[in-house]
Amino acid sequence: MAEKDLRENPFRDEIYDYLLAHGYVAGQKADYDYKHALDIGKLFAFLEATQAEELERFKATYGSRYQERYVELLCQKIENRGLLTSLNEWVEDYASGTKFSLAFFKSGLNAMSEGLELYEKNVFSIRKEFSFEDKPEPYRVDLALFLNGIPLVMIELKKQTAGQKAVFEGTKQFQTTRNPGELIFSFNRRTLVYFTLDEFAAFLTTRLDRKETKFLPFNRGSEDEGAGNPVVPGKHSTCYVWEDILQRDMLLRIIREFMFIDDEGAMIFPRFHQLRAVLRCEQDVQKNGVGGRYLIWHSAGSGKTKTIAWLAKRMINHPDINTVIVISDRTVIDGQLGAELMNVDGKKGVAQHIDTTSKDLLKKLNDGGYIIVTTLQKFRPILNEIKRNEERNYAIIIDEAHSSTAGKSMSKASETLTGKSLKESVELDDVYEDLEDGQNQLLRDGAAIRSTKNVSYFAFTATPKKETMELFGTRTEIGKTYFDKYSMRQAIEERFILNPLLCYTSYQDFYRIEKKKEDDTEYDSAKAQAAILNYVTTSDEVIQTKTEIMLSDFIERRQTWLEGRAKAMIITPSRKHAVCYKLAIDEYLKKHGCGFRSCVAFTGTIELDGLKFTEEQMNKDYLEHGVPCDIKSIIHKNDDCRIIIVADKLQTGFDEDALCVMYIDKKLNSSVKAVQTISRLNRTAHNKRTFVMDFVNDPDMIQAFFTQYYGGELYLPTENETDPNILFAKRDHILDYCVVTLLDAQKIYSLISANEESSGELTSLLASISRNYRALEPDRRKAFALELKKFGKLFYYISAVYNVWNPDMEQLAVVFSVLYNVLYEREVTPDIDASELVELVEYSTKLSQEEFTIILSAEDQAFDGISTDVAAADRTMSVIDEIIEKFNLRYAHADEEIGDIITDLSSDKDLQSNVQNSSTSAYEAAVAERLSSRIMDGLFDGTVNGDTEKAEFYTELSENTSALIQIRNSIIRKIKDLLLAS
């Protein structure tokens, strides 16, 4: 086979022939005007075919010069307005009174045959080996695509079979041999998009800037959720580029509906997954009508804000949708959404950022035709003014469906849009008054998604929970799953985000406490241990020790990153911890003469040692014109603000590309919280590295949390979906307590419905029920009250999931919520002042693993079903001696024992020989075996000698897989150090 056949010629010809067979025509070299970078033949052929009458009037004015004059007007128009805008506007001439369209788009035409006929007469032409220079030996582009004589797309092809890749040779060719100063390559004056592709991967850019040209991946994603493309039987993996994207209809849609110039002057071309998600949603609504639910699982780095904006634009143009509402709970995203919506649509007044009065929103909802961008906090005040209108249809786009966006107010938002009454909205407030902090309130409030016949929901999230999946997921043969997905793995491999787990260091804390005084009082054991842990972890010794570790690490090893701009974030477990760290860190920075500062982020006021602290007061050094700045402005505007201390703030919705380092001193006890928190590091920057130091969390658990959202399938199996009939069982179980009857419930509901909540009849009835309640044993009273509360949550959740509203069950949900408020005896336990009970006598924190990589893999995962049981927390009462014993067993002495184990086993000659001469897997197994034997010896020794503490320690250690792995790795590291030293 000839060498040229191995290169791109057959590849080029295959694409060329395909496009010619699907609506393109061949361009001719003789028709190309090098000076104006236009195909004159195709330009005027289009005008003759679509606007002949206007062209005749134009000819009558300019005679034989009409072509020259029109080209002048066209070039002037593009020069003033840019090509992208000009394609959607007129080329006008005052002297002749004419105006011409450069192209016809379906969305800009009526559905009459005349309009479609004009659309079909757009001329798409293609040139291969396109010589764009008028020289004897010009540079050539493999393929050039024109629309009505105007160059739109340039394509350079490479073949990996010839040792060339698009990502390397293709991008380099555009960077080095295509002069952006030439008209045809000038930004937004001629060519709009540049592709380079080989058989396996595709990349594009919209601006050539020599070596600064940035190409983005334009790939579908591989079978294993990574970068690249899947195998296509019998075809090139990149065939979608010419078979789908470059097809006439699709390319015109992209130009008209997706491409835009952003606020920074960049021309935006949708990434593949953005285009796919929007079009799939639009097509499904067209096929199945309004009323669907769509879970869009797009990772950080997916460009979610733009995807939401494009989707909102498509939905507001849907003939069956009156109003689009975009809801976000983050001010920064809220603002970005408003800006992006204006960018992608360009119509003033269509995208409305509602932050004024309730009447403003009410008017927009009633008028229809608007995209309303708002937060629930701004949306809520007027919800009860809007009555149901079944003839109006809505699209609700929820940003981060697991967050507080979907909270208690969301249920009321849906009540407004589905037309439920004021009374029902008030009842919802009662039912959901006591939701647990940090949970997905929308998913617990199911009422938010009820009666969706006139509402389509589009829920965007990077970290879907099982409740999110059940409410918004698409049903498949195996259960419910996402509608569209862009994985974390693909985002990382395509370099839109960084992997924040590449460099991870973990520590383990050890504490020993003693009691201060004799005390026989019994305390709630769990609360007492929590109070003690809070007390010891805010002690001066602990705070100063960790401050020393963190800041010495940052100063010695991290502060030079990003040319001295790197910032670090300290994740603290409470506001008090944040205040303590701020004071200690400022003292450390002053003592060591560091040339940078810290800031702190927390809410409210904290009192410490008789002094009151607020975020604003502690950040008083950062002033702008004498006025305190908000925390995000402080961080973004002050390069010397390099240590950011946070307590439940800035862990989501915070973008700072200079954030390279994270020090974690807080338990991250859920996959959503862990991924969101640590992923603050993943924003990209040139030459950026990341580092995590974790004092609290098990690295294996962090790995498991990230693996859930890294890639692979994520679904709720059919057998784990919530059984709606559980409501009947719950109802019967509640009635079996013989506290309230169905007749009682009906009477209570009728009195509430009649607005007679203060009537004597209701009071008497509730008093009778209260008497029955008090007759129960204490444990049964608590269980009964919790069943009442659980019933309401289950009812609204199940009603939302199954889109079935049972009026009888609704009445019970309302009544049971009222009874819960009346009957539930909230336990008031005095605060435990641990400082009066115990003192910290010994503390150390030991390095467990240093600068290792937490390996992630794409694994299919199935959600468990949601719990429908009521679980009352067991309350164990203990005296302080027992509490101290349990605390010390958990946190004390372990460092000495573990240190002895590491020292003894690392000195073992057989193990040293194994590490020196065996494979990694072999010596890891050998060390693990010896470690297990050593632990059994310790357990036996403690048991035989009656050393209960030692026996319990080794028992607990033998069951702690993560600790065993860390100890094994420490032994291996020490052996390697000893071998190296010898």
Regions found by a protein language model. Name each.
Residues 2-323, 332, 336-348, 377, ...:
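ATP-dependent helicase/translocase motor core
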Residues 17, 21, 39, 45-51, ...:
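Catalytic cores and motor modules of nucleic-acid processing enzymes
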Residues 232-238, 467-565, 582, 586:
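Interdomain helical connector at the RecA1-RecA2 junction of SF1/SF2 helicase-like NTPases
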Residues 342-385:
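Inter-Walker segment of RecA-like/P-loop motor cores
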Residues 369-415, 422, 435-447, 625-633, ...:
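Conserved RecA-like ASCE ATPase "motif II neighborhood" in helicase/translocase motors
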Residues 406-500:
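Post-DEXD/H (motif II) to motif III coupling segment of the RecA-like Helicase ATP-binding lobe
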Residues 533-646:
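Conserved C-terminal RecA-like helicase domain
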Residues 680-708:
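Conserved segment of the helicase C-terminal RecA-like domain
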